[in-house]
């Protein structure tokens, strides 16, 4: 995957916007979990962000900057019962994003962590949850928020943003 992305960058130039939107939701009691659950969530969510940043940041810096937006979750801020594998990876992803923001902001790369505090209206989530769709986050609305983040002037960069449906308690 890294080689393919490097080839795309070599052919088309540095990306202006990169979005890391990965979640592997493992829900089970801690005592039933296995270290493989943690390795899997960390590999899919944290390691993938590290690899994506390693491939894209250097070309973005050479090109004068860009935006790198990372999708977090409620679990980025607080863990819940039965969510330890998921929450540990989302916490780590938030910390990674904060570190990258501080390191690459001076070079013109806008790094932002978004907390998606709600259930996103997808086919899979509709199969798993019996929520009213009006109470779910619409992907196109999330995309609009990401577009706005990617186009912020350097004088007012957002480094963390909470997005949630109006029906979500917080």
Which residues does each predicted region cover?
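Catalytic loop of short-chain dehydrogenase/reductase
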Residues: 67-92, 98, 102-105
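Conserved amphipathic alpha-helix within the SDR
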Residues: 1-13
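Conserved NAD(P)H cofactor-binding loop of Rossmann-fold oxidoreductase domains
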Residues: 21-27
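A short, exposed helix-loop element centered on a Lys and neighboring polar residues
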Residues: 53-54, 98
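C-terminal helical subdomain
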Residues: 106-121, 129-170
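Substrate-binding pocket helix/loop in short-chain dehydrogenase/reductase
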Residues: 29-30, 37-42
